[in-house]
Regions:
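Short, flexible loop/turn elements at secondary-structure junctions
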Residues: 1-2, 24, 133, 143
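Conserved AMP-binding/adenylation subdomain of ANL enzymes
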Residues: 2-90
Length: 170
């Protein structure tokens, strides 16, 4: 387990007034989600990538990949109109992930935007953060009220950040 996930679990329990959730292992993640039915949890990118790939693997294996793609097209069209029906359209996916999952706080490594957007499209918000064990471990975190896809967010209130010798990208 990464320390970022542990801190995320502690914060979710304290700040969101819910019990934190940490799965036993990557191979047990779906079983644990269906046992404990968390609304949110903290994870490393590999866990999110694994969940996302399993969703598509299951759809393909069951011959429902085209249905899933059509559902995404409909859902994304509705979202452009300001109508959010993701959790209804993808209720089977949500139910297979414990039934309550709304958000995953992610950190410990880089998460490809493909997986962040993919999970969002199914109705599960990914909140990226950045940290290293030597820094508490959480340094920054994306926020629901100031969410920017592909970003690790802004510094936590207790942190000051300085980028030494920035390049053209920052």
């Amino acid at each position: 387990h990464h320390t970022f996930s542990w801190v995320g679990c502690l914060f979710s329990g304290n700040l969101l007034t819910e019990w934190g959730f940490i799965c036993r292992s990557l191979k047990d993640i779906q079983k644990d989600l269906n046992t404990y039915h968390p609304q949110n949890f903290s994870a490393v990118p590999l866990a999110i990538e694994t969940i996302y790939k399993k969703i598509w693997f299951t759809a393909k294996k069951s011959g429902r990949e085209d249905i899933l793609k059509k559902g995404l097209k409909i859902s994304n069209f509705l979202m452009k109109l300001g109508i959010d029906r993701r959790r209804k359209i993808f209720s089977e996916i949500i139910n297979n992930l414990g039934g309550n999952l709304e958000m995953i706080v992610c950190g410990g490594a880089y998460l490809d935007e493909k997986y962040e957007k993919g999970m969002y499209d199914f109705g599960i918000q990914i909140i990226n953060g950045y940290g290293i064990t030597e820094c508490s471990p959480a340094v920054t975190c994306n926020r629901l009220d100031a969410y920017k896809p592909g970003s690790v967010g802004i510094p936590l209130p207790c942190n000051e950040i300085k980028i030494k010798d920035p390049d053209a990208d920052g």
